[in-house]
């Protein structure tokens, strides 16, 4: 399988998706036809989200079609060489994808050679479940099971920092809560600017920041760019 799972879409001082464009270009391998899944968009319309994505990827020769615009979404997924899943609210993304019957077809198409690109919520959707999203559950997705393309759970935008005087849980504390009730899981705390690239059966960590791996009953382990999962 070919996956590009990004923690986030924007870095300080850079345009939207700018840091990801070289990664995307490197993994295209001649692919040009893409379907975009915009359902995580809440404060922007799906048309706006699709158009923005199409504009950014056009210089790479990628032709982007919003899945909500086609008459036959299943046929569009089957024909797609690239499946792009944008960030936003993970619960809405999963709900809309499930209700349209897109989860199994997307997973099957990626397993048969389509490139999967997802950032933030889109990275969450590639995991076994969305249980490590940071998002507010604004809708009920009728279950947390997702695409299960990547075997570990990703927590995008990972940071353990708290604002001064803040008394809420750290991100690690929230992840530890999950591991109490689901000790079989492994969670990757993927900070902004980092990504996981899967190609030719190898999953490789990239980015400038330290990534953390959490397992039940174990200390967190720090990983740097180049680590192979």
UniProtKB/Swiss-Prot annotation:
Does the record's keyword annotation contain NADP?
no
Q: What does this protein do?
A: Hydrolyzes dipeptides containing N-terminal aspartate residues. May play a role in allowing the cell to use peptide aspartate to spare carbon otherwise required for the synthesis of the aspartate family of amino acids.
Q: What is this protein called?
A: Peptidase E
**A Pfam family recorded for this sequence:** Peptidase_S51
| Classification via InterPro entries | Class_I_gatase-like, Peptidase_S51, Peptidase_S51_dipeptidase-E
- Give the EC number: 3.4.13.21
Q: Which UniProt keywords apply?
A: Cytoplasm, Dipeptidase, Hydrolase, Protease, Serine protease
Name one molecular function that GO assigns to this entry: dipeptidase activity
Q: Which family does it belong to?
A: Belongs to the peptidase S51 family.
């Amino acid at each position: 399988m070919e996956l590009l799972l990004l923690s986030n879409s924007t870095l300080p001082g850079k345009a939207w998706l700018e840091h990801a464009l070289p990664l995307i270009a490197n993994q295209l391998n001649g692919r040009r036809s893409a379907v975009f899944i915009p359902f995580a968009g809440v404060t922007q319309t799906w048309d706006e989200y699709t158009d923005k994505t199409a504009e950014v990827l056009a210089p790479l020769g990628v032709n982007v079609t919003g899945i909500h615009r086609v008459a036959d979404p299943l046929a569009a997924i089957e024909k797609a060489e690239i499946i792009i899943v944008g960030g936003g609210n993970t619960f809405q993304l999963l709900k809309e994808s499930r209700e349209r019957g897109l989860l199994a077809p997307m997973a099957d198409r990626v397993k048969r050679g389509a490139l999967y690109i997802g950032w933030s919520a889109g990275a969450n959707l590639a995991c076994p479940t969305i249980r490590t999203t940071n998002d507010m559950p604004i809708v009920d997705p009728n279950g947390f099971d997702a695409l299960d393309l990547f075997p570990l759970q990703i927590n995008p935008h990972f940071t353990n920092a708290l604002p001064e005087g803040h008394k809420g849980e750290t991100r690690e504390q929230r992840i530890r809560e999950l591991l109490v009730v689901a000790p079989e899981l492994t969670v990757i705390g993927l900070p902004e600017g980092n990504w996981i690239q899967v190609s030719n059966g190898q999953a490789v960590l990239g980015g400038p920041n330290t990534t953390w791996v959490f397992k039940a009953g174990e200390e967190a382990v720090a990983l740097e760019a180049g680590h192979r999962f």
